[in-house]
């Protein structure tokens, strides 16, 4: 396996991200200096993936605060800076309301700066510096959590998903859950990377993931970058793949934008269909997500609001004209691929019922259902807080 892709570059006061709209044609970094830059990057899907958008949002605000400190333009009052940060966080959360990681990060950061603002002697600068440190710690923790998720998922698959005669796993994944969706390494794609590091990966399959093609554009890009054995398929080929005895798919591993208290999982559109197919074909279906993606305040999938995307994402497609580019310059063109006037329904996510999920891979272990056939995720947080 080659070196792992790095999609977020940060040093205090300086933040840059790979422009994912340019991938896989051009590997171009764009500078994010303000929360407004981050909001547009998230909304326009220049950065995507629940953990990544939370980190980029937090670091964008940290960068702006650092700039205000450097240029001596920050208010001296702790309360004023606290309110400034809260307003900016609320604005950033509005860029992608479905992603629980973003709202969870905002809530935790608000709590951190509120506590600091209430301490004796707090100033605007000390509150801002407390926020900057907390945002930087988020990125460090996310990468560490991803490595643990990868390890836990790989070990579970080797133990529970492989037939006795097999020592390597063939895994299917959906959308993009790697370095481009997180601080690095990835969640579901991190499991595939961990299998490869253990020399236990036979083959990886990634779906195209229509209509935004995160699989063909982003996951395929990461798999090729890391030189992992992999094959791209269209979404409609999954049933045929699982039925193919030569392919021998052992597990499907996906990410999550939100996991409800009962285990129902909102993820990229098409995930639900994969889970149904996995159940029919007897293939293990796993969700890989950090604890921050689990929302105990959301009781079930029925409570999850599903974002709808523009019709143009379905009726048009963007890419370079074949052969019309030089080494570093690619001109992207948009073409129509659907009949004009047709109505379009374009939900960004669907909800997979917990009954179709075999396990939820987290940084503290793989959570399976109890003897009653239900996930008890609340116990996970009790156990984790006590440890």
UniProtKB/Swiss-Prot annotation:
Record bears the keyword Cytoplasm: yes
A GO cellular component entry from the record: nucleus
GO annotation, biological process: L-methionine salvage from methylthioadenosine
UniProt site positions, description: Transition state stabilizer: 175
Keywords: Amino-acid biosynthesis, Cytoplasm, Isomerase, Methionine biosynthesis, Nucleus
Source organism superkingdom: Eukaryota
Subcellular location field: Cytoplasm; Nucleus
Signal peptide: none
SUPFAM superfamilies in the cross-refs: NagB/RpiA/CoA transferase-like (SSF100950)
Entry-linked HAMAP family: Salvage_MtnA
The name this protein goes by in its record: Methylthioribose-1-phosphate isomerase
Species: Neosartorya fischeri (strain ATCC 1020 / DSM 3700 / CBS 544.65 / FGSC A1164 / JCM 1740 / NRRL 181 / WB 181) (Aspergillus fischerianus)
Originating gene: mri1
């Amino acid at each position: 396996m080659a070196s792992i892709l790095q999609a977020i570059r940060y040093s205090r006061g300086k933040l840059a991200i790979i422009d994912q709209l340019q991938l896989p044609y051009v590997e171009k970094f764009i500078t994010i200096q303000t929360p407004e830059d981050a909001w547009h990057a998230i909304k326009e899907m220049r950065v995507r993936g629940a953990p990544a958008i939370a980190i980029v949002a937090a670091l964008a605000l940290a960068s702006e605060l650092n700039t205000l400190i450097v240029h001596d333009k920050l208010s001296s009052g702790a309360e004023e800076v606290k309110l400034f940060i809260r307003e900016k966080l609320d604005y950033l959360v509005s860029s992608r309301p479905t992603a629980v990681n973003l709202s969870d990060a905002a809530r935790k950061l608000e709590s951190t700066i509120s506590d600091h603002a209430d301490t004796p002697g707090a100033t605007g600068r000390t509150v801002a510096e407390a926020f900057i440190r907390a945002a930087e710690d988020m990125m460090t923790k996310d990468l560490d959590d991803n490595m643990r998720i990868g390890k836990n998922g790989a070990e579970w698959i080797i133990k529970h998903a492989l037939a006795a005669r097999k020592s390597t796993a063939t895994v299917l994944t959906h959308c993009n859950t790697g370095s481009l969706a997180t601080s690095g390494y990835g969640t579901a794609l991190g499991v595939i990377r961990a299998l490869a590091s253990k020399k236990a990966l036979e083959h990886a399959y990634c779906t195209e993931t229509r209509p935004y093609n995160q699989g063909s554009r982003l996951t395929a890009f990461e798999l090729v970058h890391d030189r992992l054995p992999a094959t791209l398929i269209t979404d409609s080929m999954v049933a045929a793949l699982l039925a193919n005895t030569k392919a021998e798919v052992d597990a499907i591993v996906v990410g999550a934008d939100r996991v409800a208290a009962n285990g129902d999982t909102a993820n990229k559109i098409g995930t639900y269909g994969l889970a149904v197919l996995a159940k029919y074909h007897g293939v293990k279906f796993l969700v890989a997500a950090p604890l921050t993606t689990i929302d105990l305040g959301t009781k079930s999938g029925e409570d999850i609001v599903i974002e709808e995307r523009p019709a143009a994402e379905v009726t048009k497609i963007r890419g370079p004209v074949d052969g019309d580019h030089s080494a570093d310059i690619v001109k992207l063109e948009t073409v129509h691929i659907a009949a004009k006037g047709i109505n379009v329904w374009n939900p960004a996510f669907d909800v997979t019922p917990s009954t179709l999920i075999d396990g939820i891979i987290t940084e503290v272990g793989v959570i399976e259902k109890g003897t009653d056939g239900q996930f008890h995720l609340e116990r996970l947080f009790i156990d984790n807080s006590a440890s």
